[in-house]
């Protein structure tokens, strides 16, 4: 049973990595990063349940990771919207300069 869950988590992580590498849109990059975080959470909860089914340490840690990922997404989207307001684009290759 754990093998199936780990395969699903690895598959989602690979999809997120592929999207992160090939995407040219900043919002898609953030979505792929969130997909990678969630796939790690799936594997974390699966391993936690497999090794110690009595404890909920893995689930609690996954909730903390979700909270941190939500804060990261909010900050990332705020930065993307601020850059869009100035550059009128969300393409990754246009944000290689730090000056406006």
UniProtKB/Swiss-Prot annotation:
InterPro entries named among the record's database cross-references: NADH_UbQ_OxRdtase_chain4L/K, NUOK/Mnh_C1-like
Catalytic activity: a plastoquinone + NADH + (n+1) H(+)(in) = a plastoquinol + NAD(+) + n H(+)(out); a plastoquinone + NADPH + (n+1) H(+)(in) = a plastoquinol + NADP(+) + n H(+)(out)
Annotated function: NDH shuttles electrons from NAD(P)H:plastoquinone, via FMN and iron-sulfur (Fe-S) centers, to quinones in the photosynthetic chain and possibly in a chloroplast respiratory chain. The immediate electron acceptor for the enzyme in this species is believed to be plastoquinone. Couples the redox reaction to proton translocation, and thus conserves the redox energy in a proton gradient.
PANTHER family per UniProt: NADH-UBIQUINONE OXIDOREDUCTASE CHAIN 4L, NADH-UBIQUINONE OXIDOREDUCTASE SUBUNIT ND4L
Compartments where found: Plastid, Chloroplast thylakoid membrane
Protein name: NAD(P)H-quinone oxidoreductase subunit 4L, chloroplastic
Coiled-coil parts of chain: none
One term of GO molecular function: quinone binding
């Amino acid at each position: 049973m754990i093998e199936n869950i780990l395969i699903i988590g690895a598959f989602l992580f690979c999809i997120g990595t592929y999207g992160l590498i090939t995407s040219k849109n900043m919002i898609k990059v953030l979505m792929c990063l969130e997909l990678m975080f969630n796939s790690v959470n799936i594997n974390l909860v699966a391993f936690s349940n497999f090794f110690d089914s009595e404890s909920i340490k893995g689930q609690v840690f996954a909730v903390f990771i979700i909270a941190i990922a939500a804060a990261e997404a909010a900050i990332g989207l705020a930065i993307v919207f601020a850059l869009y307001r100035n550059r009128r684009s969300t393409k990754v290759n246009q944000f290689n300069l730090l000056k406006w």
